[in-house]
Curated annotation (Swiss-Prot):
<keyword id="KW-0961">Cell wall biogenesis/degradation</keyword>
<dbReference type="GO" id="GO:0005768">
    <property type="term" value="C:endosome"/>
</dbReference>
<dbReference type="GO" id="GO:0005802">
    <property type="term" value="C:trans-Golgi network"/>
</dbReference>
<feature type="binding site">
    <location>
        <begin position="489"/>
        <end position="495"/>
    </location>
    <ligand>
        <name>substrate</name>
    </ligand>
</feature>
<feature type="transmembrane region" description="Helical; Signal-anchor for type II membrane protein">
    <location>
        <begin position="32"/>
        <end position="54"/>
    </location>
</feature>
<comment type="similarity">
    <text>Belongs to the glycosyltransferase 8 family. Glycogenin subfamily.</text>
</comment>
<dbReference type="GO" id="GO:0000138">
    <property type="term" value="C:Golgi trans cisterna"/>
</dbReference>
<keyword id="KW-0464">Manganese</keyword>
<dbReference type="GO" id="GO:0000139">
    <property type="term" value="C:Golgi membrane"/>
</dbReference>
<dbReference type="GO" id="GO:0015020">
    <property type="term" value="F:glucuronosyltransferase activity"/>
</dbReference>
<keyword id="KW-0472">Membrane</keyword>
<dbReference type="GO" id="GO:0005794">
    <property type="term" value="C:Golgi apparatus"/>
</dbReference>
<dbReference type="GO" id="GO:0009834">
    <property type="term" value="P:plant-type secondary cell wall biogenesis"/>
</dbReference>
<feature type="binding site">
    <location>
        <begin position="379"/>
        <end position="381"/>
    </location>
    <ligand>
        <name>substrate</name>
    </ligand>
</feature>
<dbReference type="InterPro" id="IPR002495">
    <property type="entry name" value="Glyco_trans_8"/>
</dbReference>
<dbReference type="InterPro" id="IPR029044">
    <property type="entry name" value="Nucleotide-diphossugar_trans"/>
</dbReference>
<keyword id="KW-0812">Transmembrane</keyword>
Length: 618
């Protein structure tokens, strides 16, 4: 007996039956459409061949974050509208490139076909010209993602990572001896913080750095805006004509730079840096600071020098001073170990006369210290608590983050160069500083910078939003002995040497209490006490400053400030040490409400030698 069919079997048979019916139907019409099908197949083959040729010449982009189609459209971020002066191009190439060595290949980035053909025509070179392919950066990669305001440096919650910019495709052959890249420059926007512009310059650098052997590699950047000054540096600039910039990069240094994170989204220096750093170029490296129009910073600079030597560093100490610093104070700086270099001040053209920032563009003079290959600049209100010589290993500009996408210029690695100095001067009337000072200006010039841990420029400051545990942590760091911090930066108007040593006088002024820390204050005075005794006299208090301190104390007493520092009796011996012609500071308080400024920046000294109780004023 044959078993009856199951429903499932019926469905299978129905499917098979329908398949046979369809096959017979197709066979009946097959002959009628055979010719038309053949034509369609031939057309498809031809279109496929054309598409393959097109893709071979212009490969598609593959960006995982947000795919960007290369196709028939161009990403507007990468469009470079600069007009190339071909006479300038021909002159530069013939004079500085082709006439000096044998070249095999020329890599071209972001140039269109017409520009490539024109380049071949004007240079009359037998080299292979290779249009190098670079995938566009994903559109969700912004400057803020490359330069975030904050990263988790200690990796408490996450390991910071940078967005990935596509790498350029570098051919094995021919050898690329000249790289040419055309850069966008939209001056209507933030051209100096342009992801595409950065991407193209890094791509050109990678092609140059991929070179093997000892032969020279040149890089030409076509840009109406100045290129990143610390990728291809001023020392490497061979020549410039109009918007054409020709560089001969140091390939070893370039490879080191390309190993760093693309932005400040990751640390360029490990949190636990090596304490013992050897450099073959130590004689060409120095710490540097600057004093202008501010003799009351002399004591701070002397203490900073002491702290550097206590950290174990033997690098040169260079201080730039202007004519407002007296001979007496300069003698103290020399005794502390500073090598003095005089300089002409540079006025900030946007500053109000006699304002605090009128002469702070004088910091640009650091780039004229060309007897050194690298310097670590420090503000004169810093202490170096642990050796930071290892920072000489890192490139310009290495610094801590400040806010938004910006770095703090209080401590930074600088590579002196006359051409970089000239760049700073050439743009002084065009580039606008976000804060009216040198830090804002430098941040507009050096937008590609490298983040170092905040422990290497730790600010003596309590933010309004700091939680109690954060304040406790900072307080512990300020007073740690042996130190945990590398560098402590004494922010605020009342510096430790302008207070009595008994406590931080910022406590007595309500608007300065965010800068008050007795622990940090004690740390500074430990360094002071370690100085040779003959240097202590440069930290004595003027009578006018004593009056200011007493005025502030009385105001705190009237306000019954809860911290209670105004109750502390002063034991600092400097209270009763007088070195001026007029020492009755108490009488100054009779009319102090009428003029309550210490005018520290405008102090003057007599040229006569000081006697034991008549030392010049700070």
């Amino acid at each position: 007996m044959i078993p009856s069919s199951s429903p499932m079997e019926s469905r299978h048979r129905l499917s098979f039956s329908n398949e046979k019916t369809s096959r017979r139907r197709f066979q009946r019409i097959e002959k009628g459409v055979k010719f038309n099908t053949l034509k369609l197949v031939l057309i498809c083959i031809m279109l496929g061949a054309l598409f393959t040729i097109y893709r071979f010449r212009y490969p598609p982009l593959q960006i995982p974050e947000i795919p960007t189609s290369f196709g028939l459209t161009t990403d507007p971020r990468y469009v470079a509208t600069a007009e190339i002066n071909w006479n300038h191009m021909s002159n530069l190439v013939e004079k500085h490139v082709f006439g000096r060595s044998e070249y095999q290949g020329i890599g071209l980035i972001n140039l269109n076909d017409n520009e490539i053909d024109r380049f071949k025509e004007v240079t009359k070179s037998d080299c292979d010209h290779v249009a190098l392919h670079l995938d566009y950066a994903a559109k969700n990669i912004t400057w803020e993602s490359l330069y975030p305001e904050w990263i988790d440096e200690v990796e408490e919650f996450e390991v910071p990572t940078c967005p990935s910019l596509p790498l350029i495709q570098i051919p094995g052959k021919p050898r690329i001896d000249l790289v040419i890249a055309k850069l966008p420059c939209d001056k209507s926007g933030k051209w100096s913080r342009d992801v595409a512009r950065l991407h193209l310059q890094l791509a050109a650098a990678r092609v140059a750095a991929s070179s093997k052997g000892l032969h020279n590699v040149h890089v030409i950047l076509v840009s109406d805006c100045f290129p990143i000054p610390n990728l291809f540096t001023g020392q490497e600039l061979v020549a410039r004509q109009g918007n054409i910039w020709l560089y001969k990069p140091n390939l070893h240094q370039l490879r080191q730079k390309l190993q760093l994170p693309v932005g400040s989204c990751e640390l360029s220096v490990p949190l636990q840096a090596k304490d013992n750093f050897y450099s073959a170029g130590a004689k060409k490296e120095a710490y540097a600071t600057i004093l202008h129009s501010a003799q009351f910073y002399v004591c701070g600079a002397i203490a900073a020098a002491q702290s550097i030597r206590m950290s174990g560093s033997t690098r040169d100490l260079v201080i730039l001073v202007d004519e407002t610093i007296s001979e007496y104070h300069k003698s103290g700086l020399v005794a502390a170990g500073w090598k003095i270099q005089m300089f002409q001040r540079i006025r900030n053209p946007n500053a109000v006369p006699n304002a605090y920032n009128e002469w702070n563009y004088s910091k640009f003079r650091l780039w004229q210290l060309t007897e050194y290959s690298k310097i670590i600049f420090i503000d004169a209100d810093m202490l170096i608590l642990r050796n930071i010589d290892f920072l000489f290993e890192f490139p310009e500009i290495s610094a801590t983050g400040n806010n938004a996408t910006l770095f703090n210029s209080g401590l930074m690695v600088v590579e002196p160069s006359n051409s970089t100095f000239q760049l700073l001067m050439d743009n002084i009337n065009e580039v606008v500083s976000y804060n009216g000072g040198d830090q804002g200006y430098l941040n507009e010039i050096f937008t590609w910078w490298h983040r170092i841990p905040k422990h290497m420029n730790f600010l003596k400051h309590f933010w309004e939003g700091d939680e109690p545990e954060i304040k406790k942590m900072k307080t512990s760091l300020f007073g740690a002995d042996p130190p945990i911090l590398y560098v402590l930066h004494y922010l605020g108007y009342n510096k430790p040497w302008l207070c009595f040593r008994d406590y931080d006088c910022n406590w007595n002024v309500d608007i300065f209490q965010e800068f008050a820390s007795d622990e940090a204050h004690k740390t500074w005075w430990r360094v002071h006490d370690a100085m040779p005794e003959n240097l202590h006299k440069f930290c004595l208090l003027r009578s006018k400053q004593k009056a200011q301190l007493e005025w502030d104390r009385r105001q705190a007493e009237k306000g019954n400030y809860k911290d209670g520092h105004w109750k502390i009796k002063i034991k600092d011996k400097r209270l009763k040490t007088c070195f001026e012609d007029f020492c009755f500071w108490e009488s100054m308080l009779w009319h102090w409400g009428e003029t309550n400024s210490t005018n520290n920046s405008s102090t003057t000294t007599t040229s006569s030698p000081p006697h034991k109780t008549a030392l010049p004023s700070l």
